[in-house]
Amino acid sequence: MAWTLVLLVLLGTSSCLDAKELHKKIDISALLESGSGSGEEGSSGSGSAPEPVRDQDVDWKQFKIKPEQCLDKGENCTGDPEQCQENWQEMVVQCPFSCRFCSQRSIDDVTECTDARGAACKDWADNRNDCLRFPQFMSTECTKSCKLCGKETNGKKFDKDVRCIEWAKNGYCNEGELYKEKCPHNCEVHKSIKKEPKGPYPYPTESLYPYQYWQLYPAPGPAPYPPYPYPTAAPYPYQYSPYPYTPYPPPPYPNPYPQPPYPPPPPPYPNPYPQPPYPPPPAPCSGPGPCPYPGPPPPPYPAPTPYPPPPPPYPEQVPPPPPPPPPPPPPPPYPYPYPYPDESENTKHKSKKHAKHHEKHHKENHSKKS
């Protein structure tokens, strides 16, 4: 483990090493090849084999390359993320940015209201919400896109928390000086907003580190079941005898719905038409003489009233009425006994007769006057 101690000592000497200097000072391959022993190929020898490099033996916090020097030089840096641990001595030179070997700047070191990552910052801030997901990186590399500064304050005031814009919009800047110290830019922009009564901001305003990942917050587990007051046996199908392969015999399965006892049979149905009692037999003769033979015949037994016939299941169908007889044929046209004369001839006859009568009457009047 001597080479491991050497590695830790070299890593601890500088908190901010350049990638090339780090690669020069730490030559893991030389350490792996180091060792004592003698012998040729095929012959036996003595010595100790090199121990493999383990991930937990490397202090990853010491890889703090300056942001301006932390750039990927390889072509396929994002292809296999496991190479950052398995082949880290090469990846720290070729892919320091993809392997997150860069040191993080502080918000206090920011002096210009710009985006150090260029046009990508706007996409990260607006579409991916990275200002809240990665606050340390976004607050220093995308200060303008996260709205930690702006032209409202001439780019001279910088907020120290990416949540400042939400605090200012909900009126927290008017609640105390602490918010004004952390958020000088947004408190100046939203100074006219008063705090709402209920405070709709969902995030905690005070915590040790406001952006702890969910793994760091211990999630409450499910509530434990209350203890039973007494030990309860397993359900019946799993209650086996302590003897092997001899389960308890199952009890008789009760009927889930017990049936009531059957009712007693009904008494015999009485005859709806009781029969009269039979006449008593004739009394024996009391006299000394022989009894007359044959005895008087018994009175005729009245016949029982016949049962009414059962009603038919369906009413009898009435036969349809016969069709009406066909109407008699119309009589032939009856001829008139005296056909009327033609009206035109009758009119002519009457006009001639009237003219003769008028002429005769005129002549008689004329003769009387003369």
Curated annotation (Swiss-Prot):
Compositional bias segments (type: Pro residues): 306-340
- Where is it mainly found? other
Q: Name one GO molecular function term.
A: toxin activity
Q: Which tissues show it?
A: Nematocytes. In late planulae, transcripts are found throughout the ectoderm in nematocytes, with high concentration of expressing cells in the oral pole. In primary polyps, is expressed in nematocytes in the body wall and physa ectoderm and in the upper and lower pharynx.
Protein localization: Nematocyst; Secreted
Domain ShKT, chain residue ranges per copy: 70-102, 113-149, 155-190
Any Pfam family the entry gives: ShK
Residue span of region Disordered: 34-55, 306-370
Q: What SMART domains does the entry give? A: ShKT (SM00254)
The UniProt entry's sequence similarity note says: Belongs to the NEP3 family.
Q: What is this protein called?
A: Nematocyst expressed protein 4
The disulfides recorded in the entry are 70-102, 77-95, 84-99, 113-149, 121-142, 131-146, 164-183, 173-187
Domain of life where this protein originates = Eukaryota
**Sorted UniProt keywords:** Disulfide bond, Nematocyst, Secreted, Signal, Toxin
Q: Indicate, by first and last residue, each region the UniProt record lists as having compositional bias (Basic residues).
A: 349-370
Q: Can you list the GO cellular component terms from the UniProt entry?
A: extracellular region; nematocyst
Q: Which residues form the signal peptide?
A: 1-19
Q: Where is the composition biased (Gly residues)?
A: 36-45
**Secreted found in the keyword field:** yes
Q: Does the keyword Methyltransferase apply?
A: no
